[in-house]
Each structure stands twice: as structure tokens, then as C-alpha cells.
Amino acid sequence: MSKEDSKQTLRAQMQEELQGLDPEERRGRSLQICNHVLELPVWKQARVVVVFEPFKHEPEITPLISDLQRRGSEIIAILPTARSQHDVAIFGPIDLVLVPGIAFTRNGARMGRGFGFFDRFLAHRAIAAIKIGIAFRFQIVESLPLESHDVKLDLVVTD
């Protein structure tokens, strides 16, 4: 099986698991993830944070956005309609990036949603920022078929 076939198979398996998650369980698990992030020293110190708009079955991050608003942090939202790095204009340093994905490893490897946007964004725009993957526990796998351009995350937070 080719690397691309492996990625597509894993992506399909994870999508099925994400879609099978009961909405109430998704909310509860999302809250656990957010609570773990809120306890991180790097989160508490971050002043400029890139967030993502979760797709329907991904972890919900509204409590994190609320915390940033309460603290007066600058929030940069990456929307699903942004298909290229040129769709996002950021002028200045970024402290932290919350990163969505389909699958992750414990050592920071990530398989994205399949569009390549976050990979390009992380490679070109947020090199010095702390990169945190946001995932449900079942999205953690032993290994991923990676490409040379894939950017490792500093941390992956789960429920």
C-alpha cells in the first residue's frame, strides 16, 4: 500500500470514528481537552493565539476562545474557507497555535484534514510558536505516514 493510500485509509477510519461519537459525549470530551489546555503554563502565558474553527465532529474549543477573550489575548481564527496560506494575513509574532487534525502520534506527528493548509501555515508562518494539537484520545495512533514538509507539533492534548 502506498503512503497516500495509507493516509486515505487512516483518514477514512478516523472520520468514521469521529462521526460515530455521540454529540453529548463529544461535548464532554471536548470540555476535558479544554480543561487540560487551560492548565498548561504555555497557554496561560500566550498573548497571541491562532485558533481553528472545528469541523462538525472535531473537539469543540469555545471554552478556550472564551478564556482568551477574558484575558484580552489576541485571537487569530483560521476558518475552513481559508484554502491557502495567503488567505490569512498575520503581521507579528504568534505565541501559540491550536492545531486540528484527523490523527496524531504522542511525539507530535499529525495527519491533517487533507487540504494541506495547516501544514503550509505552520511551515511558513508560525515556526517559533508553540504548536498544540487538539484531539480525542482515539485519534492518537502509533505512527503516521509522514511527508518531508510535515511539521511536528510541540504537544498534543487529549481528553
Walk through the language-model features, giving the residues of each:
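N-terminal active-site beta-alpha-beta segment that forms phosphate/nucleotide-binding
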Residues: 2-93
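Conserved phosphate- and dinucleotide-binding cores of soluble alpha/beta proteins
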Residues: 83-159
